[in-house]
Curated annotation (Swiss-Prot):
The lineage of its organism: Archaea, Methanobacteriati, Thermoplasmatota, Thermoplasmata, Thermoplasmatales. It comes from Thermoplasma volcanium (strain ATCC 51530 / DSM 4299 / JCM 9571 / NBRC 15438 / GSS1). It catalyses: N-(5-phospho-beta-D-ribosyl)anthranilate + diphosphate = 5-phospho-alpha-D-ribose 1-diphosphate + anthranilate. PANTHER family: ANTHRANILATE PHOSPHORIBOSYLTRANSFERASE. Pathway: Amino-acid biosynthesis; L-tryptophan biosynthesis; L-tryptophan from chorismate: step 2/5. This is Anthranilate phosphoribosyltransferase.
Length: 330
């Protein structure tokens, strides 16, 4: 069986060896130096389909599968934009789409998806039963990754010190404990788009995988975006976010200051920052298309933007938080 030495040498390993490798580096007696070596090796050599499936075999054992959608990005695109996936998830929920979001605090950027929810005052569910209750009662739940995959805590220090996207950035988007049947995944890596499409198709999920040609792990409003649509087969196409959202200012959706990003995020969801609102609506579009709420990106964008401008989206966040106050220990 191939192992750590092979990965460090830049060699690929088979599915079973990858599973065993994760079991080794996730043990408490494995040193951070060893973990860093493995994560760095994967960063430079890339991850194959077989290796990805091996890691999934070791980590991912969902007990349920819900008719809902997760929208998530890998992070690591170094753009320091607002957390658009979480805001888009709330917009989608306001339009009647069940959203089961799985995420974490930022490890490489200024502001992570869980940071947004924590700043809103959200109390994260502690188990699958509580998560299912939240989803049923308000069409929305946000699950914090380390709560459901405790081993992730072991890697948090190493990931922050490395400062670049690791294998866990790419694993995270497919590890949702409620196993929602629909996924929208933004990838900072072109190579990982094909891995995701293969994995999600193999697992029987419907999915839209996106990557901006400027490197953004979202639909970019500044360039073309590559898209892979997965639904029993795989279709590739390109979306021009510039022609859909029209003149989004980069300095209104991006900053290295977490407090400013937080401000942009909430103002965007309220419709008070038009550039951020457009960016959020643009990235809500694939969720609406996946759920047959719109037939094309232009119509989906307009529907999402109207939900923001009318106050419907922010009212949804307020409803989520109102219910959340009575569920602090669930």
């Amino acid at each position: 069986m191939m192992g750590i030495e092979d990965i460090v040498l830049g060699l690929n390993v088979d599915r079973e060896s990858a599973k065993r490798l994760y079991e080794i580096i996730s043990k408490e007696d494995c040193s951070d130096v060893c973990r860093a070596a493995v994560l760095t090796a994967f960063h430079f050599k890339g991850v194959t389909r077989e290796e990805f499936m091996g890691f999934l075999d070791a980590i991912y054992k969902p007990t349920v599968s819900v008719d809902a959608t997760d929208i998530v990005g890998t992070g690591g695109d170094k753009k320091n934009t607002i957390n658009v996936s979480t805001a888009s998830a709330i917009v989608a929920a306001s339009l009647g789409i069940p959203v089961a979001k799985f995420g974490n605090r930022s490890s490489t950027g200024a502001y992570g998806s869980a940071d947004f929810m924590a700043d809103a005052g959200y109390s994260f569910p502690r188990d699958v039963e509580a998560a299912l209750h939240r989803l049923k009662s308000n069409n929305f739940v946000f699950m914090l990754a380390p709560t459901f995959i405790p081993e992730f805590k072991i890697f948090s220090t190493v990931r922050k010190r490395l400062g670049f996207p690791t294998l866990f950035n790419y694993l995270g988007p497919v590890l949702n404990p409620l196993a929602p049947k629909k996924r929208v995944i933004g990838s900072a890596s072109t190579e990982m788009m094909d891995v995701y499409s293969y994995i999600l198709n193999e697992l029987g999920y419907q999915a839209i995988i996106i990557r901006g040609q400027d490197g953004m792990d979202e639909i970019t409003p500044f360039n073309f975006t590559d898209v892979i649509y997965v639904d029993g087969s795989v279709e590739k196409y390109v979306v021009d976010g510039r022609s859909i959202s029209n003149d989004v200012r980069y300095d209104k959706i991006s900053s290295q200051d977490p407090s400013l990003i937080r401000k942009f995020n909430f103002m965007g969801l309220k419709g008070e920052n038009e550039d951020a609102a457009k960016f959020i609506a643009l990235n809500t579009a694939p969720v609406l298309i996946l759920n047959k709420k719109a037939g094309n990106y232009e119509d989906a964008y307009r529907l999402a933007l109207e939900a923001i401008k009318s106050g419907q989206a922010y009212e949804k966040l307020e409803a989520i938080m109102h219910e959340n106050k009575g569920l602090r220990h669930n």
